[in-house]
Design a protein with these regions (language model features):
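Mg2+/Mn2+-dependent nuclease catalytic core
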Residues: 76-148
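Nuclease catalytic cores
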Residues: 1-82, 88, 112-114
């Protein structure tokens, strides 16, 4: 019985973190820039800097936060918001970053990959000659995962 209670509490705590903290962290992350000067929450900036160069590149002056995107995929109209977008015209690349607060990274993985595929398909219509890639930032442990 005790294990069942622990499992329930653990699940509840994880869901609470994913929803409650998720909104707060998202709001702070959209205001962070690392260059030309550091702007935003100092604690989150430190986590981004400690996570490595690849993650830091999503928070430079050429990045955009909370980017709306809409269009048709298979005759269905979709309207989405990209957490972080970096377009580099010199290298003809587009990189998408989606923040996720889930502790159990496998639970919604298929759903998140499908969402990333939607972003990619919509962006391919805007940037047909660019290489587009997508990443998830798992906020519970600050792991950057390449998806597509």
């Amino acid at each position: 019985m005790n294990n069942q209670i622990n499992d329930f509490v653990s699940k509840y705590d994880g869901e609470q973190f994913a929803t409650g903290a998720g909104r707060e962290i998202h709001a702070k992350l959209q205001k962070i820039y690392l260059s030309p000067t550091k702007v935003g929450d100092a604690e989150l900036i430190a986590k981004i800097e400690n996570a490595g160069d690849e993650l830091q590149s999503f928070f430079m002056e050429n990045s955009k936060a909370e980017v709306p995107i809409a269009g048709f995929i298979n005759n269905e109209f979709l309207s989405r918001r990209i957490d972080r977008l970096v377009v580099d015209d010199a290298t003809k690349t587009v990189r998408v970053l989606d923040y996720k607060t889930d502790i159990n990274t496998d639970k919604f993985r298929d759903k998140y990959i499908a969402k990333m595929n939607e972003y990619i398909k919509l962006l391919q219509k805007i940037y047909p000659d660019y290489k587009i890639s997508g990443y998830i930032l798992w906020l519970h442990n600050w792991t950057l995962e390449y998806i597509i």
